[in-house]
Amino acid sequence: MNILSSVGSFGFLTLISRVLGYFRDILIAIFLGTSFLADAFFVAFRLPNTFRRLFAEGSFNSAFVPQYSKLDIKKKAFEFANSVFNLLIFFLFVLVCVAEVFMGGVIYIISPGFIENPEKYNLAVTLSRIAFPFLLFVSLSSFYSAILNTKGRFAVAAAAPIILNLLLIASIFYAKFFDKELVYFMAWAVTLAGILQLIMLAIYAKKYFTPKISFNFKISSEVKHFFKRLLPSIFSSGVMQINILVGTVIASFQTSAVSYLYYADRIYQLPLAITGIAIGTVILPSLSKEIFQNKDGKNFFLQNRSIELSLFLSAPATVGIIMATEPIISTLFGYGSFDQESIRQTSKALFVFGFGLPAFSLLKIYSSFYFARGNTKFPFYVSVLTVIINILISIILFNRLGFVSIALGTTISCWCAILIYQFFLLTNGMHKFDKTFIARVSKIFVCSFIMSAVLSFLLFKFQFAFEHGSIHKIFSLTVIVGISALIYFLLSILFKSFSIKDFKVKNYDTK
């Protein structure tokens, strides 16, 4: 398998989804801004969407792929997958039914501050009831994605979330054109998108797996092992999403804070699509195979190149976000109901999140190093510690910094997790930095530093352009980003801080 090609296709399609997600969010910003309607919808959307990210971008793959990859007998692999599929249907259906009945309590738990505004609280409950069945469909979609990933078919799984964003965009236009209640149509679009994603992935995975629905459960040792690993995987793979959910709980006590954090989150998620999620997802099947075959040399090579690639992509994105925070928010969201105060407050959160971008990217990759070895316990413990650190920082500093403390807690806690992961990888002989890694990472930092000087000059030259209309802002930001990125990549070629040929490795036969 060509790792770079797989990362490229997965990352590109994920990036397309994120760009469509941005377009969706700019429409929401124009029509809803940071109003109580926006807060209510974001809470309702965040609940099932958090589960989507938990399953689709980490935990299910982490528990399923290594286990499924080891079963080289076709019949045994089918029995394992079929049992998992049927159990998922049963448990998820029960979970959705229970949540629908007790949704009022669920919203009180995740957004306790909403109770002070009955209209906002009741709207959030109603919208959540409409959108929550998405969880059932997206979780089953993740099952099919995992099947496809074990066969080296990453593109379809990456393309599936595009459906969600297209339907949400369509629902916004439909509601505005026919003068309907916007937030209700958006909530229904979420559930419909889940159904369509599931149908699409089931069709593409049919070649490799067609389930036999049966509730006469046969729980083999492999199935027990899978579910034993799944819960720790959910927590450890989804630590970023859990941190965001924790942030939503705390932010609900400050007016519009949920919206500020949501919009800031959407910006750094764009580069994160490639710098962490794509690399971590693609590297897991390869690494699982090599570890199963006891090829330590190749393990270390794959791990070093994965970290390199993540830093190569996240370093310039980090510099750009930190230095151009307000121009980015103003250009991407500063229209309609999204006023100057919204721009200023959202920029504060994005600035702090920017310092955490490399850690957010590496988190997915480092946890994959453990998951590939069948170790879900250690990432689970690290994730628990990470969430505790995040909660403590967010609560302690909330009175002084407001919602910014939530961004700070997320950033610091994720960097702590990276340091812990790396320390134990080195001390347990599961990783060794090679000379190539040290040389290239040093060059990446040099290239990023030079790019920051160029970016600073460009921001100074274009500073007044962001005070004008949308055309001026979009043109100026495009020029600034384009020139800065070009300088960075030219410097990278000059200093040889990245090598494409290292990723053209045939790791295993995916057919």
Predicted regions, residues:
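Membrane-embedded alpha-helical bundles of multi-pass transporters/translocases
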Residues: 1-511
